[in-house]
Amino acid sequence: TALQKGRDDRLILHGQAPGYVERRTFEQIEQWGDTYKHPELYDANGKRKFNKRMLYGEEIDGKGMFFEAQLKPVFPKDGKCDITDSGIHVYDTDEVYFVLSMATSFNGFDKSPSREGIDPSAKAAGILDKALSYNYRTLKQRHTEDYRSLFNRVDFKLASSPEQKAMPTDKRIEQFAQT
């Protein structure tokens, strides 16, 4: 994963996700005699290839999805910023907001994101450029509408008395289950 300053004062973070992650411990795998099920970690004789359960890049034949995030400070009035290894330093302004875009190399369930993936840099830049064409109010409105369409789809109300309303939800559910 690398951090860099991009064109027009964008902060860019790009990298590659692990190509393999094993949730079981080596001890569990070995105790259960399952080394043969994990050729990424063990050779044909059951010896460990690595002493870690998370493999990146060439350790795992280049597998792993690429990603990029781009962050751009926007100054509605005057303002400046410096992007350094230690952070984003904003000055000479009373107001700033940040626009963030992110993309991955995912190109379909049937394609390798590391070999047949799309360019996350170009995608993240395109998303950010499009977002920057809107003012803050419009961006917020569009974001809110998008969020609500995904997460505000259920209206759930429990009929209750004032005493029940004062009771924590977990206790109300417990009480309801007993009736």
Annotate each predicted stretch with a short phrase.
Residues T1-T179:
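Aromatic-residue-lined binding/catalytic grooves and analogous aromatic/hydrophobic interfacial grooves
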